[in-house]
Amino acid sequence: ALDKYNIPLELKYLAIVESALRPTAESRVGATGLWQFMFSTGKMFGLNVNSYVDDRSDPLKATDAACKYLQALHKRLGDWDLALAAYNSGPGNVSKAIRRSGGRINYWNIRQHLPRETAGYVPAFLATMYIFEYSKQHGFNSDGPRIPYIATDTIHIKKQIALEHVAHLTDIDLAEVAFLNPQYKLGIIPVVKNQTYTLRLPIDKVGVFVSNQDTIYAYAQQAFNKREKPLPE
Protein backbone atom coordinates (compact mmCIF):
# COMPACT_ATOMS: atom_id res chain seq x y z
CA ALA A 1 0.00 0.00 0.00
CA LEU A 2 2.85 2.42 0.74
CA ASP A 3 4.27 1.91 -2.75
CA LYS A 4 0.83 2.57 -4.24
CA TYR A 5 0.68 6.00 -2.61
CA ASN A 6 4.39 6.89 -3.06
CA ILE A 7 4.98 6.89 0.68
CA PRO A 8 8.46 6.07 2.05
CA LEU A 9 8.55 2.39 3.00
CA GLU A 10 10.08 3.27 6.35
CA LEU A 11 6.73 4.69 7.42
CA LYS A 12 5.49 1.11 7.88
CA TYR A 13 7.14 1.31 11.30
CA LEU A 14 4.63 3.97 12.32
CA ALA A 15 2.10 1.21 12.99
CA ILE A 16 4.46 -0.17 15.63
CA VAL A 17 4.61 3.20 17.38
CA GLU A 18 0.84 3.56 17.16
CA SER A 19 -0.38 0.14 18.23
CA ALA A 20 2.53 -2.31 18.65
CA LEU A 21 0.95 -4.02 15.59
CA ARG A 22 -2.20 -5.00 17.48
CA PRO A 23 -5.23 -4.66 15.15
CA THR A 24 -7.64 -4.49 18.09
CA ALA A 25 -5.66 -1.93 20.10
CA GLU A 26 -7.78 0.86 21.54
CA SER A 27 -6.53 4.00 23.25
CA ARG A 28 -8.14 5.70 26.26
CA VAL A 29 -9.67 8.28 23.89
CA GLY A 30 -11.11 5.72 21.48
CA ALA A 31 -8.47 5.57 18.73
CA THR A 32 -8.59 2.04 17.35
CA GLY A 33 -6.63 -0.41 15.22
CA LEU A 34 -3.11 -0.77 13.82
CA TRP A 35 -3.07 2.89 12.82
CA GLN A 36 -5.12 4.22 15.77
CA PHE A 37 -7.83 6.03 13.84
CA MET A 38 -10.37 8.10 15.71
CA PHE A 39 -13.94 7.47 14.54
CA SER A 40 -14.26 10.78 12.65
CA THR A 41 -10.88 10.56 10.89
CA GLY A 42 -11.48 6.95 9.96
CA LYS A 43 -14.84 7.84 8.46
CA MET A 44 -13.19 10.57 6.36
CA PHE A 45 -11.00 7.89 4.78
CA GLY A 46 -13.65 5.26 4.21
CA LEU A 47 -13.45 3.22 7.42
CA ASN A 48 -16.93 2.21 8.54
CA VAL A 49 -17.92 1.37 12.10
CA ASN A 50 -21.19 -0.26 13.13
CA SER A 51 -22.48 -2.68 15.76
CA TYR A 52 -20.80 -5.66 14.12
CA VAL A 53 -17.82 -4.33 12.19
CA ASP A 54 -15.00 -1.87 12.85
CA ASP A 55 -12.95 -1.30 9.70
CA ARG A 56 -10.31 0.45 11.79
CA SER A 57 -9.32 -3.02 13.03
CA ASP A 58 -9.12 -4.44 9.50
CA PRO A 59 -5.36 -4.41 8.77
CA LEU A 60 -5.75 -3.98 5.00
CA LYS A 61 -8.47 -1.33 5.01
CA ALA A 62 -6.86 0.60 7.86
CA THR A 63 -3.43 0.55 6.21
CA ASP A 64 -4.90 1.84 2.95
CA ALA A 65 -6.70 4.61 4.86
CA ALA A 66 -3.52 5.49 6.79
CA CYS A 67 -1.62 5.82 3.51
CA LYS A 68 -4.28 8.16 2.12
CA TYR A 69 -4.18 10.23 5.30
CA LEU A 70 -0.38 10.43 5.37
CA GLN A 71 -0.34 11.35 1.68
CA ALA A 72 -2.85 14.14 2.33
CA LEU A 73 -0.83 15.44 5.29
CA HIS A 74 2.38 15.44 3.25
CA LYS A 75 0.67 17.27 0.40
CA ARG A 76 -0.55 19.91 2.84
CA LEU A 77 2.67 20.33 4.84
CA GLY A 78 5.35 19.40 2.29
CA ASP A 79 7.54 17.44 4.71
CA TRP A 80 7.36 13.89 6.06
CA ASP A 81 8.45 14.81 9.59
CA LEU A 82 5.69 17.40 9.73
CA ALA A 83 3.24 14.88 8.27
CA LEU A 84 4.12 12.46 11.08
CA ALA A 85 3.63 15.18 13.68
CA ALA A 86 0.26 16.02 12.14
CA TYR A 87 -0.72 12.35 12.16
CA ASN A 88 -0.27 12.42 15.91
CA SER A 89 -1.74 15.78 16.87
CA GLY A 90 -3.66 16.94 13.81
CA PRO A 91 -2.57 19.37 11.07
CA GLY A 92 -4.04 22.32 12.97
CA ASN A 93 -1.56 21.94 15.83
CA VAL A 94 1.35 21.69 13.39
CA SER A 95 0.23 24.81 11.53
CA LYS A 96 -0.08 26.62 14.86
CA ALA A 97 3.46 25.54 15.83
CA ILE A 98 4.78 26.83 12.50
CA ARG A 99 3.19 30.23 13.14
CA ARG A 100 4.50 30.37 16.71
CA SER A 101 8.02 29.59 15.51
CA GLY A 102 7.96 32.52 13.13
CA GLY A 103 7.18 30.54 10.00
CA ARG A 104 9.84 27.87 10.32
CA ILE A 105 8.95 24.63 8.53
CA ASN A 106 11.50 22.18 9.91
CA TYR A 107 10.12 19.80 12.53
CA TRP A 108 13.11 20.22 14.83
CA ASN A 109 12.72 24.01 14.75
CA ILE A 110 9.01 23.95 15.63
CA ARG A 111 9.19 21.02 18.05
CA GLN A 112 9.13 23.19 21.19
CA HIS A 113 5.80 24.66 20.06
CA LEU A 114 4.10 21.29 19.58
CA PRO A 115 2.07 19.41 22.22
CA ARG A 116 4.33 17.42 24.56
CA GLU A 117 3.29 14.04 23.16
CA THR A 118 3.92 15.18 19.59
CA ALA A 119 7.32 16.61 20.52
CA GLY A 120 8.36 13.06 21.41
CA TYR A 121 6.46 11.35 18.60
CA VAL A 122 8.87 11.76 15.70
CA PRO A 123 11.91 10.82 17.86
CA ALA A 124 9.98 7.71 18.97
CA PHE A 125 9.29 6.84 15.34
CA LEU A 126 12.93 7.35 14.34
CA ALA A 127 14.12 5.19 17.24
CA THR A 128 11.67 2.43 16.29
CA MET A 129 12.72 2.60 12.65
CA TYR A 130 16.39 2.35 13.62
CA ILE A 131 15.81 -0.66 15.88
CA PHE A 132 13.98 -2.60 13.18
CA GLU A 133 16.23 -1.55 10.29
CA TYR A 134 19.39 -2.49 12.18
CA SER A 135 18.02 -5.26 14.40
CA LYS A 136 20.48 -7.90 13.20
CA GLN A 137 23.48 -5.68 13.86
CA HIS A 138 22.30 -5.30 17.45
CA GLY A 139 21.48 -8.95 18.01
CA PHE A 140 17.69 -8.70 17.82
CA ASN A 141 15.93 -11.62 16.15
CA SER A 142 12.40 -11.60 14.76
CA ASP A 143 10.08 -14.57 15.02
CA GLY A 144 8.28 -13.51 11.86
CA PRO A 145 4.52 -13.23 11.40
CA ARG A 146 2.23 -15.60 13.26
CA ILE A 147 0.49 -16.48 9.97
CA PRO A 148 2.07 -15.14 6.74
CA TYR A 149 -0.35 -12.98 4.75
CA ILE A 150 0.44 -14.91 1.56
CA ALA A 151 -0.68 -18.10 3.29
CA THR A 152 -4.25 -16.75 3.64
CA ASP A 153 -7.13 -15.86 1.33
CA THR A 154 -10.62 -14.41 1.62
CA ILE A 155 -14.13 -15.70 0.99
CA HIS A 156 -17.17 -13.50 0.36
CA ILE A 157 -19.77 -14.34 2.99
CA LYS A 158 -23.32 -14.93 1.73
CA LYS A 159 -25.16 -15.45 5.01
CA GLN A 160 -24.61 -14.30 8.58
CA ILE A 161 -22.17 -16.53 10.38
CA ALA A 162 -20.20 -16.54 13.62
CA LEU A 163 -16.46 -17.09 13.73
CA GLU A 164 -17.02 -19.87 16.26
CA HIS A 165 -19.13 -21.74 13.67
CA VAL A 166 -16.36 -21.37 11.09
CA ALA A 167 -13.76 -22.62 13.55
CA HIS A 168 -15.85 -25.60 14.60
CA LEU A 169 -16.79 -26.77 11.10
CA THR A 170 -13.44 -26.20 9.40
CA ASP A 171 -11.37 -27.57 12.28
CA ILE A 172 -9.44 -24.35 12.97
CA ASP A 173 -8.65 -22.94 16.38
CA LEU A 174 -11.09 -20.11 17.16
CA ALA A 175 -8.24 -17.86 18.30
CA GLU A 176 -6.65 -18.22 14.87
CA VAL A 177 -9.88 -17.36 13.05
CA ALA A 178 -10.37 -14.33 15.31
CA PHE A 179 -6.75 -13.27 14.75
CA LEU A 180 -7.28 -13.30 10.97
CA ASN A 181 -10.60 -11.40 11.21
CA PRO A 182 -10.14 -8.77 13.94
CA GLN A 183 -12.64 -6.33 12.43
CA TYR A 184 -15.66 -8.34 13.57
CA LYS A 185 -16.37 -6.88 17.00
CA LEU A 186 -18.82 -9.51 18.21
CA GLY A 187 -17.25 -12.44 16.40
CA ILE A 188 -20.11 -12.37 13.89
CA ILE A 189 -19.88 -11.64 10.16
CA PRO A 190 -23.14 -9.92 9.19
CA VAL A 191 -24.88 -9.77 5.85
CA VAL A 192 -26.02 -6.25 4.99
CA LYS A 193 -27.55 -5.00 1.75
CA ASN A 194 -25.02 -3.25 -0.52
CA GLN A 195 -22.14 -4.26 1.78
CA THR A 196 -19.57 -6.97 1.15
CA TYR A 197 -17.99 -8.76 4.08
CA THR A 198 -15.24 -11.32 3.80
CA LEU A 199 -13.80 -14.11 5.89
CA ARG A 200 -10.03 -14.59 5.89
CA LEU A 201 -8.74 -18.14 6.39
CA PRO A 202 -5.52 -20.09 5.87
CA ILE A 203 -5.39 -21.12 2.21
CA ASP A 204 -5.68 -24.82 3.03
CA LYS A 205 -8.97 -24.14 4.84
CA VAL A 206 -10.56 -21.98 2.14
CA GLY A 207 -11.34 -25.04 0.04
CA VAL A 208 -12.79 -26.80 3.08
CA PHE A 209 -15.15 -23.88 3.69
CA VAL A 210 -16.22 -23.53 0.05
CA SER A 211 -16.83 -27.27 -0.34
CA ASN A 212 -18.98 -27.35 2.79
CA GLN A 213 -20.50 -23.87 2.76
CA ASP A 214 -24.14 -25.01 2.52
CA THR A 215 -23.69 -27.20 5.60
CA ILE A 216 -21.79 -24.43 7.42
CA TYR A 217 -24.44 -21.78 6.69
CA ALA A 218 -27.24 -24.15 7.72
CA TYR A 219 -25.44 -24.96 10.97
CA ALA A 220 -24.92 -21.25 11.65
CA GLN A 221 -28.58 -20.45 11.01
CA GLN A 222 -29.69 -23.24 13.30
CA ALA A 223 -27.33 -22.01 16.02
CA PHE A 224 -28.59 -18.42 15.71
CA ASN A 225 -32.21 -19.62 15.90
CA LYS A 226 -31.46 -21.37 19.19
CA ARG A 227 -30.00 -18.26 20.80
CA GLU A 228 -32.08 -16.54 23.44
CA LYS A 229 -33.85 -13.49 22.05
CA PRO A 230 -33.20 -10.18 23.87
CA LEU A 231 -36.94 -9.40 24.09
CA PRO A 232 -39.89 -11.72 24.77
CA GLU A 233 -41.88 -12.77 21.71
Residue ranges and their predicted role:
Residues 4-5, 44, 49-52, 56-76, ...:
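Extracytoplasmic and endomembrane cell-envelope/extracellular-matrix remodeling and assembly machinery
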Residues 6-7, 11, 22-26, 33, ...:
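Glycine- and small hydrophobic-enriched segments that form the cores of compact globular domains
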Residues 8-16, 32, 80-85:
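Alpha-helical scaffolds flanking conserved acidic
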Residues 15-17, 21, 35, 177:
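Long, contiguous hydrophobic alpha-helical segments, chiefly transmembrane helices and signal peptides
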Residues 18, 38-42, 91:
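Short, small-residue-rich loop/turn micro-motifs
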Residues 25-46:
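Short, surface-exposed glycine/acidic/tryptophan-bearing loops
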